[in-house]
Amino acid sequence: MSLSLWQQCLARLQDELPATEFSMWIRPLQAELSGNTLALYAPNRFVLDWVREKYINNINGLLNDFCGAEVPLLRFEVGNKPVSQNDSPPQRVVTHTPVAPAPQNTSVRPSWDNTAVQPELSYRSNVNPKHTFDNFVEGKSNQLARAAARQVADNPGGAYNPLFLYGGTGLGKTHLLHAVGNSIMARKANAKVVYMHSERFVQDMVKALQNNAIEEFKRYYRSVDALLIDDIQFFANKERSQEEFFHTFNALLEGNQQIILTSDRYPKEINGVEDRLKSRFGWGLTVAIEPPELETRVAILMKKADENEIQLPGEVAFFIAKRLRSNVRELEGALNRVIANANFTGRAITIDFVREALRDLLALQEKLVTIDNIQKTVAEYYKIKVADLLSKRRSRSVARPRQMAMALAKELTNHSLPEIGDAFGGRDHTTVLHACRKIEQLREESHDIKEDFSNLIRTLSS
C-alpha cells in the first residue's frame, strides 16, 4: 500500500458523490498511511462526526476494493496531519502590494465618510444579534448551507473561502450571514466582522471618491477579519465597484480573511458581472438554499409561534404550511397576521380562524398555482408544448419535463395523486408517485435538475 491509496479513494468519491457534498465534506480531509492504519484528519469535530456518520461505508467499501485482504484500519482525528521531514510546507505567492495595516484608532468612523460628527467604532459590524444558528430552522432544503456556514464560523478563512450562498428571496441567506458574524464575534470579541448589502459597498466607494479618500476605503475593507456581503448581484453593470471589489477580494483571500457572499442566483448566471469575479466566487464553496419543504415549513411556524409564546396547534401549522410554500418570509408574515388577529379579537387559533384571517392570501395563492399554470410554465421553460406533457410520448425530451411538472403539482397544489394523474392525460397515480420520487432523486444527483426545480418553484410562487 502507498500514500496514493487515499488519492484513489478521492478520485472515486468525487465520481460517486454530488460535487457540493464532495467539496464540503471529503476534500478538506487529510490522510496519513502508517503501517496498517489510515488516519483521516478533519478540520473540526463537526466535519469528523458528519463524515463518520454519512460516508464511512463509502470509504470502507473503496478500501476493500483497492486493498483486498490488506485493508487498513481506519482512524479519524481532528486537526492537521503531522508534517513529515519529506513534506515541504506550501508556499503562498503574493501577487499584489501588501495592504497597509488597519489604523490602530478604532474610535472614529472611516475617514472617507465625512458625515461623522460623533465618535463611533470604525468597524461597524451591522450584524443583527437576533439571527443566530440556534434560531435557524434546519431542514433538507437548507441543511448543506447551514452546515457550510457553521464550519466557516468555526474556522474562518479556512477551506470554504469564499462561501457563496444562493437561492430565492426569503429563504434564510441573510439569517446565515448574521449567524456566522455573531458566532465569530462570540469566539473573538475584537474580531473585525462587517456585514453589508452590496449597495452599501458601492455607496461607500462613491463617498470615498468624492472625498478623495480611496486609500482609506481600501485599507478599511482589506483589514477586516470577515466580510459578509448580501445580494452580490447588485454589483451588475457597476464597473468601478466591480474593479475595486476584485482587488479587495484578492487581498482578503491572500490574507486568509473570510468572505461570504449571497445572491439570488448561481454565480455564473449573474448577468452584468465580470467573468473574473464570477470565477472567483466559485473558488471556495457554492451552496444553494432551496424553498423549504413541508416539514421544514411546519417547524418554522412552530418555532416562530414558540418565540411569540403562542400555542399553535399542529394541524393549524400544517394547514398554513401546506398552502404557503414559496419562502420563510411569507410564512412568518402570515403567522404574524394570524397572531395579530387572534390578539385583537380574542379568538382561538383554529383552521377556520386561519382560513378567515388569511383569506386574501390563500385565495391569491390558489389562483396563482394551478395544474394548468404549472403545465404552461413547465412547457415554456423546456420549450415544448403542453400537449406533449399530456401525450403518451416517452422520449427523454418530453418524459423529464412531464415528471418535473407532476412533481411540482404535488409540491405546489393540494390535489391528490389520482387528480394530478388525471390532469396529465389520465395517468395512474403510481405514475405520478414514480415521477415525484424520480425528480427528488435527480435533484440530489444533478445540479441541472436541481436548478430547474428551483427556478420553476420561484417562477410559480412569485
Curated annotation (Swiss-Prot):
Region listing for Domain IV, binds dsDNA, in residue ranges: 343-462
Q: Name one GO cellular component term.
A: plasma membrane
Kindly state which keywords UniProt assigns to this record, in alphabetical order: ATP-binding, Cytoplasm, DNA replication, DNA-binding, Lipid-binding, Nucleotide-binding
What is annotated about its quaternary structure and interactions? Oligomerizes as a right-handed, spiral filament on DNA at oriC.
Q: Where is this region: Domain III, AAA+ region?
A: 126-342
Locate the residues binding ATP.
Answer: 170, 172-174
Concerning its family, UniProt says: Belongs to the DnaA family.
Could you tell me the superkingdom of the organism this chain comes from?
Bacteria
Q: Where is this region: Domain II?
A: 86-125
PROSITE patterns xrefs: DNAA
In Swiss-Prot or TrEMBL terms, this protein is called: Chromosomal replication initiator protein DnaA
